C-alpha cells in the first residue's frame, strides 16, 4: 500500500482552564485510510454550555470546525466541509470525519467554556 493512500490524522487533548479541566477527547491518536470515516469523541464534566471543535494543520494556527452554544444547537466554523457534529446533551460534542482525506491530516482539539 502506498503512502498516498493513507491519511494520518493526529488527535490531541486540549486542557482548558487554570487547573486540570474536565475535557477529554478520544481517541488521542488514530491513522485512517483515505475514504474511511470515524468519530472523535469529546466530553466535558464542567457543565459548560459552549463547546468548540478545532483543527491545527502543520505550521498553521487553530481553525474552528464547528461550535455549539448549548445542547442541540450547533453551527459551522470556518472549515466545516467533510465533518459533521451533534450535541444531544451538555457533556458531549462528537466530531465525525465523513470520508478521510490527506487534506484532513491535522491535530484536532476540543474545548469548552461558560
Curated annotation (Swiss-Prot):
Disulfide connectivity?
42-110
Q: Which InterPro entries match?
A: Ig-like_dom_sf, Ig-like_fold, Ig_V-set, TCR_beta_variable
By its UniProt entry, which SUPFAM superfamilies does this protein fall under? Immunoglobulin
Residues in the signal sequence: 1-21
> Which Gene Ontology terms of cellular component type are present?
plasma membrane; T cell receptor complex
Q: Which domain of life is it from?
A: Eukaryota
Decide whether keyword Cell membrane is in the record: yes
Q: Which Pfam families match?
A: V-set
Q: Which UniProt keywords apply?
A: Adaptive immunity, Cell membrane, Disulfide bond, Glycoprotein, Immunity, Immunoglobulin domain, Membrane, Receptor, Signal, T cell receptor
Q: Where in the cell is it found?
A: Cell membrane
A biological process (GO) annotation for this entry? adaptive immune response
- Entry keyword Disulfide bond: yes
Going by the UniProt annotation, this protein carries glycans at 84
Q: Where is the Ig-like domain?
A: 22-114
Function of the protein: Probable non-functional open reading frame (ORF) of V region of the variable domain of T cell receptor (TR) beta chain. Non-functional ORF generally cannot participate in the synthesis of a productive T cell receptor (TR) chain due to altered V-(D)-J or switch recombination and/or splicing site (at mRNA level) and/or conserved amino acid change (protein level). Alpha-beta T cell receptors are antigen specific receptors which are essential to the immune response and are present on the cell surface of T lymphocytes.
- Fetch the PANTHER family from UniProt: T CELL RECEPTOR BETA VARIABLE 6-8-RELATED, T-CELL RECEPTOR BETA CHAIN
Q: How does it assemble?
A: Alpha-beta TR is a heterodimer composed of an alpha and beta chain; disulfide-linked. The alpha-beta TR is associated with the transmembrane signaling CD3 coreceptor proteins to form the TR-CD3 (TcR or TCR). The assembly of alpha-beta TR heterodimers with CD3 occurs in the endoplasmic reticulum where a single alpha-beta TR heterodimer associates with one CD3D-CD3E heterodimer, one CD3G-CD3E heterodimer and one CD247 homodimer forming a stable octameric structure. CD3D-CD3E and CD3G-CD3E heterodimers preferentially associate with TR alpha and TR beta chains, respectively.
The name under which this protein is listed is Probable non-functional T cell receptor beta variable 6-7
Gene this chain is encoded by = TRBV6-7
